[in-house]
Amino acid sequence: MTYKIMIVDDEPANLRVLERLFRPDYQVVTAPSGAEALALLDQHDVALLISDQRMAAMTGIELMMKTVAIRPQMVKILLTGYTDVGALIEALNSGLVYRYLTKPWNNDDLRTTVSRALEHYEVMKSKHILGMENQRLRARLAEISDMASEALDLVSVEKELAAPPEEPEVYELLG
């Protein structure tokens, strides 16, 4: 399976380098801004987003927060040349960001991180599918349980109607 990854950076040189790095193994979509990335996410089923943190109109974390509604299963990696420790800690602790890497990055480390992120994507996707299947099966089990309960109620009423009366007065009346 060839995964589709999106790279977002407002520095054209970084976009070109990252695209060349990943194009042999993945389908790569690039965007020079957060706004363009959001528009492209409506058109592409992206498994992984790699974004620069410091961009002009929208930070990488702001972009990632906005992508949750569009692509909730997408895994996100943040690249940063500057350390805004508070924002990074918040993004990591909330589960918004899978990993963050500093610029300049090591190509081998980045490839390894991307590979692991895509493994994580598969696990999360499977978890989501299994959760939906579990929900469907629970609903079906509830339906079956309701039908069984109704059937038992009918059997109980049928037994009551078929049982001989327990009061001797009834026999006297019936003769």
Q: Residue locations for each model-derived region?
A:
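Two-component/phosphorelay signaling modules centered on CheY-like receiver
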Residues: Y3, P12-T30
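C-terminal output helix
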Residues: T83-G86, W105-V114, L118, E122
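Helix N-cap/capping motif at the beta->alpha junctions
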Residues: T30-A39, G60
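Active-site residues of response regulator receiver
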Residues: D9, D52, T80
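Alpha4 helix (beta4-alpha4-beta5 surface) of REC/receiver domains from two-component response regulators
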Residues: E62, T83-Y100
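The feature encodes the CheY-like receiver
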Residues: L15, A56-A57, T80
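Active-site beta3 strand of CheY-like receiver
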Residues: M6, H44-I50
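C-terminal output/effector regions of signal-responsive regulators
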Residues: I129-G175
